[in-house]
Structure formats: structure tokens, C-alpha cells
């Protein structure tokens, strides 16, 4: 009886460690693709004409909107796949390539083109004109973050694991919101070279993640073709 209890305890420990590792993986992947550090110069340029209180409110609304977008994809992404007949392995390959492109831009300390268009204009009289576009979409919850969310959900098999993905989204958005709220402070304390160095490090990590995602997708597609 004691032996059974001991085995049961060890099984639970291993199970919860796997869940913790999945949460950390999800949080880190989302944090890197959101890239709040790299967004600091953009957010500063978009919001500096507004008073400080208004800037904080803009960032808060953008974070909430971005969180809702990612949660919608997390909860209903599989239905979208089913409707369009998209397999998860095909999405892994396509999404991995997109993440690799974003990571490549980050390695060169460039703003990913999927996140920003140089010809975007601002209407300073309307806060919502920058809260939803371009701040919430595509800067914060851009194609990279949406792709990462969908891939994380594809790895889940239980309600608990789906809850872990939701928690990863909320955590990554919370930390990103805190960082972006400190944009003025960080701009004053850290020069652009320090920000670029951090972006390059995050880009290197994202390259590794994207290559692994592409490889997993290719193996899955090959196996499905072999079975047929």
C-alpha cells in the first residue's frame, strides 16, 4: 500500500512537472513572438504626443484587445481549421516559416514587416485609431503571436492543458503590458543599442523554436502521406 502511494505521488509530481514545463514553454514562446522590448521604440513613437495618463490607457486597452484576440484563436482555432480543411501539420510548416521570417528580422534588429507598415498614419484626435490598429493588431497580437497560440493549442489533449495555454497567454500579455507601460522609463534609461541587443537574443531563440516547429510539421506530413 505504501509502495502504491509512493508510485502515485511520483506519477503526480512528473505530471505536474510536465504541465509546468508546458506553461513555461508557452509563456516564453508567446513573450518572444509578442516581443514587447522590440516594440518599445514603436509604441513610444505612436504614443508620445499624448499625456502620460492617456498613454497608459492606450497601452492598457491595446493589451486587453490583444488578449481577447489570442484567446479567441485559442478557443475556436480548431473549428477554423476544420472549416477550411487545414491540418495542424500543414499549419505548423506554414506558421514555422512565418515565425522564422519574424525571427530573422529580429536577428537584424529590424521591425518585422508582418507587424508594421511604414505608410500607416495616425489620427491623434482619436485614441481608438491606434489602440486597435496598429497597436493591438498587428503589433502586439500579430501573425506570430496568433500562430504560436494555434500551435500551442494543437499540442493540448485535455481541458487542463488548454487552461495552461490560456494561462500562458494571460501571463505573456500581463508582462508585455507592464513592460510597454514603462516605455518612457526604459527609453530614458536604455539606449537603442541595448534594446537591439536584447531583440537579437530573442530572435535567436525564436529561430530555434521556428525550426523545431517546421521540422515537426514536415515529419507529421510525411507520416500522413506514408499511411495513405
UniProtKB/Swiss-Prot annotation:
SS bond partners: none
Transmembrane segments: 22-42, 68-88, 133-153, 163-183, 201-221
Keyword field: Cell membrane, Membrane, Transmembrane, Transmembrane helix
Pfam family of the protein (one): MarC
Recorded GO CC terms: plasma membrane
Membrane topology listed for this record: Multi-pass membrane protein
NCBIfam families reported in the protein's UniProt record: NAAT family transporter
Family: Belongs to the UPF0056 (MarC) family.
Protein name: UPF0056 membrane protein MJ0972
Annotated organism of origin: Methanocaldococcus jannaschii (strain ATCC 43067 / DSM 2661 / JAL-1 / JCM 10045 / NBRC 100440)
Amino acid at each position: 500500500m505504501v509502495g502504491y502511494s509512493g508510485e502515485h505521488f511520483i506519477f503526480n509530481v512528473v505530471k505536474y512537472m510536465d504541465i509546468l514545463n508546458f506553461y513555461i514553454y508557452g509563456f516564453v514562446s508567446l513573450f518572444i513572438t509578442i516581443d514587447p522590448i522590440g516594440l518599445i521604440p514603436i509604441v513610444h513613437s505612436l504614443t508620445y504626443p499624448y499625456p502620460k495618463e492617456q498613454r497608459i490607457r492606450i497601452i492598457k486597452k491595446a493589451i486587453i484587445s490583444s488578449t481577447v484576440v489570442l484567446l479567441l484563436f485559442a478557443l475556436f482555432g480548431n473549428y477554423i481549421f476544420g472549416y477550411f480543411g487545414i491540418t495542424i501539420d500543414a499549419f505548423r510548416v506554414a506558421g514555422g516559416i512565418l515565425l522564422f521570417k519574424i525571427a530573422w528580422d529580429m536577428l537584424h534588429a529590424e521591425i518585422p514587416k508582418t507587424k508594421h507598415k511604414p505608410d500607416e498614419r495616425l489620427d491623434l484626435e482619436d485614441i481608438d485609431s491606434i489602440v486597435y490598429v496598429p497597436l493591438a493588431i498587428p503589433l502586439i497580437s500579430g501573425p506570430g503571436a496568433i500562430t504560436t497560440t494555434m500551435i500551442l493549442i494543437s499540442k493540448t489533449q485535455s481541458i487542463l492543458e488548454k487552461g495552461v495555454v490560456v494561462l500562458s497567454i494571460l501571463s505573456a500579455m500581463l508582462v508585455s503590458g507592464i513592460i510597454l507601460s514603462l516605455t518612457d522609463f526604459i527609453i530614458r534609461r536604455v539606449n537603442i543599442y541595448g534594446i537591439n541587443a536584447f531583440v537579437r537574443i530573442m530572435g535567436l531563440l525564436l529561430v530555434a523554436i521556428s525550426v523545431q516547429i517546421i521540422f515537426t510539421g514536415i515529419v507529421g506530413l510525411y507520416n500522413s502521406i506514408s499511411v495513405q
